[in-house]
Amino acid sequence: MNATRPQAQLTVPVVADRDHIQGPDGAPVTLVEYGDYECPYCGAAYPVLKEIQSQMGDGLRFVFRNFPITSSHPHAEKAAEAAEAASAQGRFWEMHDHLYEHQEQLRGEHLHANAQALGRTSSASIRILPTMCTQRGFVKTS
């Protein structure tokens, strides 16, 4: 008996120019997270997702898309913008991890101070955040 595996197509395809991707393109499993850095459920899922990535290795392609829910999380959009600023410097995943590991420090003054202390954003990057977020397909909710 030759069982075939079900194949699924993503409604919104993964695009390297827009998405933040970890893992090989040819991985048998693609997991797309629409995440909000201030969401407590996303924060609780973060270590679980890290463990899944660790266990699956090259069998998983993980894709993160910023999805700040501003109606519930007033600091989520600025946190996502900081992640995009870090992305412009090739350091998205470092900032991504930092934001989830320090969810209690997402207020503007903490966010910019931490980002600059970590060397993730420059003053120029902070000024062009709205443009960068639009170019990366930043999902905004209001």
For every predicted segment, state its role:
Residues 1-32, 115-117, 121-127, 134, ...:
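Non-globular targeting/processing and membrane-anchoring segments
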Residues 41, 131-134:
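Residue-level preference for long, well-ordered alpha-helices that form the structural scaffold
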